[in-house]
From Swiss-Prot:
GO cellular component, one term: plasma membrane
PANTHER family referenced in this protein's UniProt entry, alphabetically: FASCICULATION AND ELONGATION PROTEIN ZETA-1, ZYGIN
Gene name in the database record: Fez1
GO terms assigned for molecular function: gamma-tubulin binding; protein kinase C binding
Organism: Rattus norvegicus
Modification type Phosphoserine: residues: S58, S299, S317
Tissue-level expression: Brain.
Designated name of the protein: Fasciculation and elongation protein zeta-1
Stated family: Belongs to the zygin family.
Post-translational modification: Phosphorylated by protein kinase C zeta; which enhances interaction with UBE4B and polyubiquitination.
Main subcellular location: cytoplasm
Amino acid sequence: MEAPLVSLDEEFEDIRPCCTEDPEEKPQSLYGTSPHHLEDPSLSELENFSSEIISFKSMEDLVNEFDEKLNVCFRNYNAKTENLAPVKNQLQIQEEEETLRDEEVWDALTDNYIPSLSEDWRDPNIEALNGNSSDTEIHEKEEEDEFIEKSENDSGINEEPLLTADQVIEEIEEMMQNSPDPEEEVEVLEEEDGGEISSQADSVLLQEMQALTQTFNNNWSYEGLRHMSGSELTELLDQVEGAIRDFSEELVHQLARRDELEFEKEVKNSFITVLIEVQNKQKEQRELMKKRRKEKGLSLQSSRIEKGNQMPLKRFSMEGISNILQSGIRQTFGSSGADRQYLNTVIPYEKKSSPPSVEDLQMLTNILFAMKEDNEKVPTLLTDYILKVLCPT
């Protein structure tokens, strides 16, 4: 079977306009240099390559000729190939670079491949081509890097050095001096003298702490204690023991004060809780009474209509007499056990310049709790509250 013929005219249609119209003229090289005869006889077979390109040849012939030309090209490694592939000089390279620099299409293609200064190209996770990411993605990545740096700074990577004991004591002293006491704002005028005395005691205690701290800084070292005499050591020991006693007493006082504040907080919370529960129950009772009153009015209206339709047989009946007696007993001796309620009891209260004390809140809490439970102790508790708080003897 014969090999198919290949027509090179169709494949080289784009090259034809570049050729000269005169067939006798020799073709010009790609770079504008005139061709020369090959000096090496081993390369003389390549001169007829351009003329043979136009002819019709089979695939087998083309492959064979290509192999022959390859063998000719690589036969002599010292052969000069400048005539086959002329080397550009520096001027031509510079002109081509300037031409590419002025091309808008080339600039549009190569702008996305410019490396960013903020990117670390040694990072294995970075993309192989920077052109794949748009300007928005690059901006988002820069913002993410800045956020990571801020989070690292906030997380304590650049932590400040730890404070010494002397610095901590100084900060505590400044806090105690600068922080106002919230209790002094709500204290009555009678307790102002006690507040002044306590503030003076605190200032004296602070002075003692400062003096003791200075002594510790000056003498509390191995060398300093070693060069001190026995009397000086004894005096320093007495100072330390006295400071320990004073600080222990102050600590006990502050702990007791903390317990008092916690107890006061619990009493206030319980008072507020019981008060809200009583108010909710009073609201429910009012709604229930309105509902009963409405139902009673409807029943009375219906009974009147029925009585108007019927003629009374007797002027008095046993049922009417019984109802009259029961209503009289209720008005005389009070309501029955089912209707006895202390939920709507009114507690007298006198508003003072100072808030109620813990004892007053405890008594009010007990009264409210008895009202919520509908306990019979409400009158007794209310009497005690009036005699002890409102009208003390």
